[in-house]
A protein has these predicted regions:
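Extracytoplasmic gate region of multi-pass secondary transporters
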Residues: 37-41, 251-305, 362, 366, ...
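C-terminal transmembrane helical hairpin of 12-TM major facilitator-type secondary transporters
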Residues: 318-365
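Symmetry-related core transmembrane helices of the 12-TM Major Facilitator Superfamily/SLC fold
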Residues: 199-218, 430-448
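Cytoplasmic helix-loop-helix junction between adjacent transmembrane helices
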Residues: 131, 137-175
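C-terminal ends and interior cores of transmembrane alpha-helices
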Residues: 93-126, 327-341
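Central cavity-lining transmembrane alpha-helices of secondary-active solute carriers
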Residues: 60-77, 295-308
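Juxtamembrane intracellular "pre-TM" segments in multi-pass secondary transporters
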Residues: 2-13, 225-257, 466-468
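Cytoplasmic membrane-interface "Motif A"-like loop-to-helix N-cap segments
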Residues: 80-92, 313-327
Length: 468
């Protein structure tokens, strides 16, 4: 029996890394679709007559169903009950449906429905129906996106447990960041080429279809691993029970990680959504090139997340790494908030530093969850963390959009956009940056609490991941 186990796919470095490539490629396609509209904030506002609040409302749609309908929690239960393969494929189909709704809402097809100009409709006070429908589609997409995220994490943990787990999770995360980086600088040239603000969504759907085919290949390998483990007499994991949710919720370290997660990501992902407009307005970078600077964030994360993950695998210190990343996050946003620091080389440097922070925390945080929660409950645990995270990702863009419109308008400028004269609102981003810095400061506190809890309970967060 020992012979069979030692020759299993999971013990083969080649098989493990092939699995990682397959899962990570689909993650990359998913992240591209998530952020494809971020560089087009100005075009959405001018073409669809949205305000910054409307744009924030649209981006907040990502978390509507995950938060209010608890779809993320159900996703985790589905994952632990039915498995990674089914959950991953289901998630991709849900993402495709959501992307289709989002495309319909933003494209001209929506405005011409039944011969009516629906872009002129307003419900929920002053929010255009186009923004509401786009947010609805983004919400459906968000259900699939978060479902796939937890499935991917559990898949990587399964194949790399006791091996290079932090490095693998870091590589998976950083490959996803390639999608974010591509979403920062390709949509605007694509818009200029097609004069269609929804064109990047079509490209995203095509990439996601390719990602589906790639993930099916992963499913074949994962099924083979199941068979090998069954033949080797390796017992299956415990079945999911509803009481597992209670057990997870009673774990104090779990909540420290969950709160740290929502605070940290609330200071990064909403920043990315508004970053291109910030770069244009504060640092006077031309629209065409403004997306290139925020793209440095995921690119630096791409290079550094595996590095820090490898350090965590060999040296440990995961809780300390999370503290360091949170401190760096605060410093970056405080520097972004200073009005006099307005030259574009400073913006480049700060985005790179933010990318380092963005590498430090996730490379240590996600492997740490696998140390405090049993593998049979891991899907539900990841889902609960992602649910808490989605509360922040839903509310913070709304908050930032509201603050910009309420307190940060400094005037308007007239520009020629697509041959038409447009009056564009100018914003001072100091207050939003201070809000992000506050999130980072509270994240530092919870990172210290997590380190203290680890010292008390002995989870081994400060110990290496690789079992010699």
């Amino acid at each position: 029996m020992t012979e069979k186990v030692s020759s299993s796919l999971r013990e083969s470095p080649t098989a493990r890394w092939v699995v990682l490539i397959l899962v990570s490629f689909t993650m990359m396609c998913m992240y591209y679709l998530t952020d494809a509209m971020a560089p087009l904030q100005q075009q959405l506002q001018s073409n669809l007559h949205w305000s910054a609040t409307d744009y924030g409302f649209f981006t907040s749609g990502y978390g509507w169903f995950n938060v209010f309908l608890l779809m993320l929690v159900f996703s985790g239960i589905i994952l632990d009950k039915i498995g990674t393969r089914f959950t991953g494929i289901l998630a991709i189909f849900i993402m495709l449906v959501g992307a289709g709704i989002k495309y319909w809402a933003i494209s001209g097809h929506f405005s011409g429905l039944f011969g009516l100009n629906i872009f002129s409709w307003h419900i929920l006070s002053e929010t255009p129906l186009s923004a509401i429908m786009a947010g609805f589609g983004f919400g459906v997409f968000g259900v699939g996106c978060e479902m796939f995220g937890i499935a991917a994490n559990k898949a990587v943990v399964r194949w790399f447990r006791g091996k290079e787990m932090a490095l693998a999770i870091g590589l998976n995360t950083s490959t996803g960041r390639i999608g974010t980086a591509l979403a920062m600088f390709t949509p605007l040239p694509l818009y200029n080429l097609t004069k269609n603000v929804s064109a990047p969504i079509l490209l995203s759907v095509l990439l996601l279809c390719i990602g589906l085919l790639v993930f099916i290949f992963f499913a074949v390998l994962d099924k083979r691993l199941d068979k090998e483990e069954a033949d080797a007499g390796i017992s299956k994991e415990e079945e999911f029970k509803v009481s597992d949710i209670r057990d997870i919720a009673q774990n104090r370290a779990f909540w420290y990680i969950a709160i740290l997660c929502v605070l940290f990501y609330s200071a990064v992902f909403p920043f990315i959504k508004f970053a291109t407009n910030l770069i244009v307005q504060k640092y006077t970078v031309p629209d065409l090139f403004a997306g290139y600077i925020p793209a440095l964030l995921p690119f630096s994360a791409l290079l550094l997340t595996p590095l820090f993950g490898g350090i965590s695998d060999k040296k440990g210190k995961a809780a300390s790494i999370m503290i360091l990343g949170s401190i760096l996050l605060v410093c970056v946003h405080l520097l972004f908030s200073i009005p006099s620091l307005n030259s574009f080389p400073i913006a480049i440097g700060l985005v790179i530093l933010l990318g380092i922070a963005f590498s430090l925390v996730p490379s240590a945080m996600w492997p740490s969850v696998a140390k405090i929660i049993p593998h049979s409950k891991l899907g539900t645990a990841y889902a609960m963390i992602f649910w808490v995270q989605n509360i922040g990702l839903m509310l913070v863009p709304l908050l930032i959009g509201y603050v910009l419109d309420k307190y940060c308008i400094i005037g308007t400028i007239t520009k020629i956009v697509d041959g038409k004269e447009q009056h564009l609102t100018q914003y001072n981003y100091t207050i939003p940056m201070l809000i992000f810095a506050c999130f980072g400061f509270v994240a530092i506190i919870f990172a210290y609490l997590l380190k203290a809890e680890d010292k008390k309970k002995g989870y081994g967060l400060e110990k290496p991941n690789v079992v010699e």
